[in-house]
Amino acid sequence: MKSLVLCACVLVLAFQSSSSSEIKDRLKSAVRSNLQKYAEPCFSENNATGDDRYTEEDIMTNLYAKPENAERTRKNGCVIACVMKKQDLMEGTNIKEAQVHVRINEVLMNDGPVQAEAHRIMRKCMKKVRSITQECEKSFSLHVCIVEAMDKLGQHNEHELDSDTEDEAVTEQAE
């Protein structure tokens, strides 16, 4: 459920941050701990098991897009939709966008930088999936968008570190 629950919207983020990598790690940890009570019943309701779950790597390598994984992908999307509905963040096929942002504000009220990043990611991802009319597909597409955005956060921090290391090497060579 780990990365699957990540979808449940970057909404239940309870942490502070200073770097992109730290934001990513804290997001994942907070989401896992805060959504577990919703996830298990939703897996059960959708006849899904731990074997149906996709890892972050599975998503980043597009494993879900292979034809033989269509049913697994559908189940994942339906579990995500169920979790969102239990949190009153989705009704029918519509994501309650205003409620998502209210939830982010409630959970991250004392963490401006992380709150701003969560709002940015959610605005982008909700806009991207807005026209999808099937709830399981919409929910899974939202999940994919969030995972990709989180991966970019981590990559951004790695590039900053690479850049700092290169700057140090240039400085050392100049001396």
Task: Pin down the residues of each PLM region.
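Cleavable N-terminal signal peptides of Sec/SRP-targeted secreted and luminal proteins
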Residues: 2-19
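Mature soluble extracellular domains of secreted precursor proteins
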Residues: 19-175
